[in-house]
């Protein structure tokens, strides 16, 4: 099992990033797929037509999100933590992402997925929104 940690800078405020990560209607806008999401601890979530699913563990509005992602055949908790901070540039947000207990065989795909499908999609969404 491996851990992935990376910082991403998004061109918007922490409250807008939090909304984009927790509101199912906003998630559908940047992913292009329906989403099931709630900010209730212990609620189930589903993204990208069920390709990503798990349980919401903890929320600190506009600051932190903790989720347990499910991997087929893996019983260990795979914890994803998003920590939101004011970014270095005015009006931006630094997102500290930590994803623990990634199965070795899935690690490269997960790294690519975080960059390409998750955070590049969010950056594109906020850049288009700002135009």
Task: Give the role of each language-model region.
Residues 17-18, 27, 45, 56, ...:
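Hydrophobic pocket/interface hotspot
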Residues 72-117, 121-122, 131:
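Beta-strand/loop substructures that line and gate deep hydrophobic ligand-binding cavities in soluble
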Residues 3-7, 51, 64, 79, ...:
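Intrinsic-disorder/low-complexity, polar/charged segments enriched in Ser/Thr/Lys/Arg/Asp/Glu/Gln
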Residues 12, 44-48, 109:
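Alpha-helical scaffold segments that form or flank carboxylate-/histidine-based iron centers
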Residues 28-32, 37-73, 79:
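Glycine-rich portal/gate segments that line the openings of hydrophobic small-molecule binding cavities
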Residues 1-36:
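Hydrophobic ligand-binding cavity/cleft-lining segments
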């Amino acid at each position: 099992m491996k851990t992935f940690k990376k910082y991403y800078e998004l061109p918007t405020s922490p409250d807008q990033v939090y909304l984009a990560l927790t509101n199912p209607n906003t998630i559908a806008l940047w992913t292009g797929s329906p989403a099931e999401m709630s900010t209730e601890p212990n609620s189930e979530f589903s993204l990208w037509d069920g390709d990503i699913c798990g349980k919401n563990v903890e929320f600190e509005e506009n600051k932190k999100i903790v989720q347990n992602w499910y991997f087929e055949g893996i019983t260990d908790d795979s914890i994803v933590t998003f920590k939101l901070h004011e970014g270095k540039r005015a009006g931006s947000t630094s997102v500290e992402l930590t994803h623990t207990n990634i199965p070795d065989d899935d690690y490269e795909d997960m790294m690519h997925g975080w960059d390409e499908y998750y955070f590049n999609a969010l950056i594109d969404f906020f850049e288009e929104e700002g135009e």
